[in-house]
Amino acid sequence: MPELPEVETVRRGLEPVMVGARILSVDQRRPDLRFPFPDRFPERLAGRRILALGRRAKYLLADLDDGDVLIMHLGMSGSFRVEQAGPAKTLSPRGAPPKNAAHDHVVFTLTSGGRIVYNDPRRFGFMQIAARADLAAHPLFRSLGVEPLGNELSGAALARLFAGKTTSLKAALLDQSLVAGLGNIYVCEALHRAGLSPLRQAGSLTKKSGRPTERANRLADTIREVLEEAVAAGGSSLRDHRQTNGALGYFQHNFRVYDRALHPCPTPGCKGEISRITQGGRSSFFCSMCQK
């Protein structure tokens, strides 16, 4: 499933094409994806100008000029591609699919002549429309925690969120009501860089005074560092993720621990090897020698 860096990569690819453009038409090719499309979905979007394209956790949010927001989620295998107006281009096998490819479920045609195509083989993505004024109270967003990409996440924030929690540090980081948008890959990578075990109690990052420990400060910085590097690399393409130009992300080539069980630990001076355990039904990859 695309995690925050993959969704942010898609947002940055769509933003220069969509923001300021007007939607000429919407070609909705099936009645549902993970959930049914909103009633009169094409009619409600046709003629609307896109004022901004944001992201909250793993959701893309297109602000429209009538006060509504188009909410988009990529699910397991969803992707967007941009087709600019002009002659069709011949693409390599590793490039974007041709026009009207299999599993193209929604096509947004802009007044510029360009097209934004949503492709989703497994159909776990979805799209909804909500009023911007009601978004904070919307069921999808009202329980989301802090954003980890940006200044909202800090050692003090982690100390406040994790105070008194006996759950594992990894489970706490994956709890979307605490930190929104983190997934298994980037939690494993951030914990390794921070030298913290996924099995450590989350509450151990908070002092009795409620202030953050040095570990909390280090972890907050490391999470942001890993996410920023992943976005710069276009995300991680393990199965379905592609950027809006059809290119694959390449952060998977920078993994230190994820999916690297039995490999030597890459931490300088560490003689351990990467272990794989299961936590909450998910694989955790870490080095027991240098992650404490």
Swiss-Prot record:
Q: What is its EC number?
A: 3.2.2.23, 4.2.99.18
UniProt KW tRNA processing keyword: no
Q: How is the cofactor bound?
A: Binds 1 zinc ion per subunit.
Query: Which CDD domains does the entry link to?
Result: EcFpg-like_N
A GO molecular function assigned to this protein is: zinc ion binding
Gene3D superfamilies per the UniProt record, alphabetical: 1.10.8.50, MutM-like, N-terminal
Keywords assigned by UniProt, alphabetized: DNA damage, DNA repair, DNA-binding, Glycosidase, Hydrolase, Lyase, Metal-binding, Multifunctional enzyme, Zinc, Zinc-finger
Q: Coiled coil located at which positions?
A: none
The answer to whether UniProt assigns keyword DNA repair to this entry is yes
- Renumbered zinc finger spans (FPG-type): 256-292
Q: Per the record, what are the reactions this protein catalyses?
A: Hydrolysis of DNA containing ring-opened 7-methylguanine residues, releasing 2,6-diamino-4-hydroxy-5-(N-methyl)formamidopyrimidine; 2'-deoxyribonucleotide-(2'-deoxyribose 5'-phosphate)-2'-deoxyribonucleotide-DNA = a 3'-end 2'-deoxyribonucleotide-(2,3-dehydro-2,3-deoxyribose 5'-phosphate)-DNA + a 5'-end 5'-phospho-2'-deoxyribonucleoside-DNA + H(+)
**Active site: residue positions:** P2, E3, K58, R282
Q: Which GO terms fall under biological process for this protein?
A: base-excision repair
Q: In which residues is DNA bound?
A: H103, R122, K165
Q: What cofactor does this one take?
A: Zn(2+)
Chain's role: Involved in base excision repair of DNA damaged by oxidation or by mutagenic agents. Acts as a DNA glycosylase that recognizes and removes damaged bases. Has a preference for oxidized purines, such as 7,8-dihydro-8-oxoguanine (8-oxoG). Has AP (apurinic/apyrimidinic) lyase activity and introduces nicks in the DNA strand. Cleaves the DNA backbone by beta-delta elimination to generate a single-strand break at the site of the removed base with both 3'- and 5'-phosphates.
Family named by the database record: Belongs to the FPG family.
The entry describes its oligomerization and partners as:
Monomer.
The molecule here is called Formamidopyrimidine-DNA glycosylase
Which organism is this protein's natural source?
A: Methylocella silvestris (strain DSM 15510 / CIP 108128 / LMG 27833 / NCIMB 13906 / BL2)
Task: Output the lineage of the source organism.
Answer: Bacteria, Pseudomonadati, Pseudomonadota, Alphaproteobacteria, Hyphomicrobiales
